[in-house]
Each structure stands twice: as C-alpha cells, then as structure tokens.
C-alpha cells in the first residue's frame, strides 16, 4: 500500500471504517481540506482535485397516460440518479448518457471508484429506496408501496386503482448518508371498466309466431280427423 493511499474515513469514537476510496494524496499536492461538509483533496493517481461530500439526486416517475381502468393493474416507474457536478464530466457523460445511477451507502465506495477512477464495475450493487404516494379524486393521500432501484437506477411498482377519477402520484427518495432527497410527480385518470352486455335471445318475429300457430293448428286437425276415422271404422264393424 503506497503512502498516502487509500483515502479512508473512520468513526472517531469506534475506529470503524465508514468508507474508503482509492485516492492518493501527496505532500506537494497539499493536504485535504474540509468545509461546508465537503472534503477537497488532490489525487496523485490522475492529477485531479476531488470533492467528497453528500451529493444531489434526481428522481423521475411515469404513469400510463391512457387506458387505465378501475380494478386493473398499472405499472408506475421511474429512475433515481446522481446529479453531482462530477457526473457532468465528459467521460461520465459518455459512459452514462442517461445519468449516473444512485446506489446505496453500502455500495458507494466501489461504485465511486467505478464511476471516477476506471475501476471494474462492482458485481453486487444495491440501489436506493423509493416510496410512492397517491392523492386520489376524493383528496385521500396515502402510501401505495415501497420499491428499490436496480443498478441502472430504474424502479417500478405494480398498483391497482380502486376508485375512478384523477390520481396524482408522488415518488419520494428520502435520501441517504450519500445523497440529498428528491422527489417527482405525475398524474393519470382511472375510468370505470366497461360492462360487457350479456347476449340475449332475439324475440321471434310476427311471421315466425303465426307460422308455429298454423303448424300447431294443422297438427290438431290431423289428429281430430284420425280419431274420427277410427270411430267410423269401429261403428261399421
């Protein structure tokens, strides 16, 4: 391990490692300084100055715009990304054109090395937690579920609208030790599901009714004639 590396943050009371990153400081590059909860230091590995601190985040949320029915599932989805100043570098924009995904505190050290120091991508990255709320057409505000982003920053949640009308959806990322909170809003309309009419038998036409009456009458006449014929034959005997 070279002198001045890695850069480690320890708990002052317990000595436990909070985080570490493979940056190297040198005497001629100056000592790290801290102000406004941000550490600034020179990294001799790439001759850049790094600022280490809690960064801003950006949350998005989308809902279906059409075809939403009461009682049918929909998917609410979005992203949570890191929008720190460093993510706007040419290298980062080229590698992450859709934004740098936000990750959990536990994944932060290896993730930052991957983003900024050309280290291999971590194999076990965990995302951040997002909670979704809705304001329905009755002005009832309620939580509808909690989900977690993946390594691309994407999240989704299945939910079933229970009343008709307009819904406003709020996706809230509460923040972590590494990121400030952020939230996003969208809306959709749920309509009552269409009731499919039950098939009914079409009523008989007047012609059909007269036809069957005539048939019945003819049958009755034939039966009567047959009975009379039998009686006459017996009388002759």
Show the residue positions of the predicted features.
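Signal that preferentially marks extracellular ectodomain short beta-strand elements
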Residues: 113-120, 154-162
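Enriched for extracellular/lumenal, surface-exposed ectodomains of secreted and cell-surface proteins
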Residues: 163-182
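Secretory targeting signatures
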Residues: 51, 76-78, 171, 177, ...
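Secretory-pathway ectodomains
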Residues: 1-70, 74-104, 116, 123-124, ...
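Extracellular and select intracellular beta-sandwich modules with Ser/Thr-enriched
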Residues: 142-145, 180-185
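Intrinsic-disorder/low-complexity, polar/charged segments enriched in Ser/Thr/Lys/Arg/Asp/Glu/Gln
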Residues: 73-75, 154-156, 183-185
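Glycine-centered loop-to-beta-strand initiation motif
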Residues: 139, 143-159, 165
